[in-house]
Amino acid sequence: MTNFNVMLAHPVGKKEFDKDSFIQPKLDGVRCYITYHGAFSRNHKRFMNVQHILDELRPLFNKYPHVVLDGELYNHDYKDNFNKIISLVRKQLPSDADIEEAKAIQFHNYDIFMPDTPDNSFEYRNESIKNLHKEFTLQYCKTVETYQVQNDVTARLMYYQFTNKQGYEGAILRNNKPYEQKRSYNLQKYKEFHDTEATIIGWVEGQGKRTGTIGKFLARDADGNEFGMPVMDKMPVLTKMYDIAEWYIGKTATFTYFQRTPSGSYRHPLFKSIRNYE
């Protein structure tokens, strides 16, 4: 199975999660599914620099050729350096040195899909993952800690444990439902963002269906870092913003972001508003 579509999460809040759901830490890695045929991104691009992972999974896939392992290419030692993970796993023509360095990357396996029994609950799938890791000797493939939660209070306590104590970027809530090859409310993500200000110095037009609208603002923060902040809103609003884009130059914008990068830039910046309300 090489055309597999991974299950994607909605943000927590729009729909309540079920009682007796499961919670896992949210990893800041590169989404990856692995089959008998290789390792692939969520958009089906083959990863060419994870041969150490594929080699140790070969006995597993020889015995269970139809299963799909879902997870992330990650190493918690790089939890504050997402760009390092990217640089290691996305090389298409890796040198011997690249291959050796990439052995720092692990596959963190948090779900599994079995085409012959597609209606398996998450509880069953999670037990299957644990059993596979007992059956086979796996050094580079890791299970992801998983806990059952009965209510929102328990979920928030686990979120605090994952983020404040262990340094993960958030948490994932999973209803005890079958795997869905689409974005689903049976998979929800907790993730906190920060906000700050920067001066707008330019803009970029949207592409495709967003041609003729504002795509993102270019900005400079107080430390002189220049970056782009995408703009998300309804199409009429984005069109109006594009029509008066020149007006925004020099204005102070509030934007949200997840965290700072080692180089001082921003992870996931997003325009929020013009700070002209005080």
Regions found by a protein language model. Give the residues of each.
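Phosphate/adenylate-binding "loop-and-lid" substructures adjacent to NTP/NAD/dNTP-binding pockets
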Residues: 1-14
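Covalent nucleotidyltransferase
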Residues: 14-138, 277
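Extracellular/periplasmic catalytic domains that process cell-envelope and extracellular macromolecules
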Residues: 101-102, 164-165, 211
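Secondary-structure boundary elements
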Residues: 131-141, 164-169, 225
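Amphipathic alpha-helical
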Residues: 143-194
